[in-house]
UniProtKB/Swiss-Prot annotation:
InterPro entries in the cross-refs: GHMP_kinase_C_dom, GHMP_kinase_C_sf, GHMP_kinase_N_dom, IspE, Ribosomal_Su5_D2-typ_SF, Ribsml_uS5_D2-typ_fold_subgr
Residues annotated as binding ATP: 96-106
Catalytic reaction annotation: 4-CDP-2-C-methyl-D-erythritol + ATP = 4-CDP-2-C-methyl-D-erythritol 2-phosphate + ADP + H(+)
Underlying gene: ispE
Keywords linked to the UniProt accession: ATP-binding, Isoprene biosynthesis, Kinase, Nucleotide-binding, Transferase
UniProt keyword annotation of ATP-binding present: yes
One example GO MF annotation: ATP binding
Entries under Gene3D superfamilies matching the protein: 3.30.230.10, GHMP kinase, C-terminal domain (3.30.70.890)
Family: Belongs to the GHMP kinase family. IspE subfamily.
Annotated GO biological process: isopentenyl diphosphate biosynthetic process, methylerythritol 4-phosphate pathway; terpenoid biosynthetic process
Name under which the protein is recorded: 4-diphosphocytidyl-2-C-methyl-D-erythritol kinase
Task performed by this protein: Catalyzes the phosphorylation of the position 2 hydroxy group of 4-diphosphocytidyl-2C-methyl-D-erythritol.
Length: 282
């Protein structure tokens, strides 16, 4: 196996709040959400190829190759830039699929930034984020790498700096269908818009929570268990749920109690993604 020339993280994200303001004529929903990164995520390795081939390697079952966002991101950048080089890409998967913590979108953003570096394209963040948006609404925030208040379908980003607590994230063993939740007839779609600043704290609910709890008892159970120790929230459309703690020791203590029956992890909130911290020292 060829040795990776560059190894980069693909961090998780949390939606600290998610409000649905209405449905647009094109069927998409107008949102307001607050993204923050975690110092925890997938890891991608990259090695240049001279033959133009994009090849993804992973041992994780269920990760489709040609339809994977990593491959789509690489081929889109290759096409748009006219680059004739290829890339071997290795994925070490830690983030759950269908978990609402941005695994696929983060992998795509890390791919765009990694290939931009190794192919020496010189694209700026604006151009990479614009390409990222064609892959998914959450990709641009990972490309930019700063915690953000997002509007529109999630593509209008305003950098913000919320507090950076420790989080316990629980991972119910179920993949939530985002399309199913957003088509739920009982989904709240008329929340009044809020201002970007001050950073939302008190008004920080997730409008998808009730619909997810109705359809996925595993998520409801995780929220109830975590809610005995701290305010339990849903990230995105789930399935992951999370709670904030003032320090790692308290998060670890609750994790030890809950992860006997549930999968989960403890991670620090970060307003600058660990991907961008790594890129800054290259």
């Amino acid at each position: 196996m060829v040795e990776a020339q560059l190894v980069l993280p693909a961090p998780a994200k949390l939606n600290l709040m998610l409000h649905i303001l209405g449905r647009r004529p094109d069927g998409y929903h107008e949102l307001q959400t607050l993204f923050q990164f975690l110092d925890y995520g997938d890891e991608l390795g990259f090695a240049l190829r001279q033959d133009g081939v994009i090849r993804l390697q992973t041992d994780v079952p269920g990760v489709a190759h040609d339809s994977n966002l990593i491959v789509k991101a690489a081929r889109a950048l290759q096409k748009q830039s006219g680059c004739t080089l290829g890339m071997d890409i290795w994925l070490e998967k830690r983030l759950p699929m269908g978990g609402g913590i941005g695994g696929g979108s983060s992998d795509a953003a890390t791919t765009l930034l990694g290939l931009n570096h190794l192919w020496q394209l010189g694209w700026d963040e604006d151009r990479l984020a614009q390409l990222g948006l064609t892959l998914g609404a959450d990709v641009p925030v990972f490309v930019r790498g700063h915690a953000a208040f997002a509007e529109g379908v999630g593509e209008i980003l305003t950098p913000v700096d919320p507090e950076e607590p420790w989080y316990l994230v629980l991972v119910p063993q179920v993949a939530v269908s985002t399309a199913e939740i957003f088509s739920d007839p009982l989904l709240t779609r008329d929340t009044a818009p809020i201002k970007v600043r001050p950073v939302p704290k008190g008004n920080s609910r997730n409008d998808c929570k009730a619909a997810v709890e109705r359809r996925y008892p595993e998520v409801r159970n995780a929220l109830n268990l975590l809610g005995k120790f701290t305010e339990a929230k849903l990230t995105g459309t789930g399935s992951c749920v999370f709670g904030a703690f003032p320090n790692k020791a308290e998060a670890d203590k609750v994790s030890a109690l809950l992860t006997e029956t549930l999968t989960g992890f403890v991670a620090k909130g970060s307003n600058i993604s660990m991907l961008h911290r790594k890129l800054q020292i290259l």
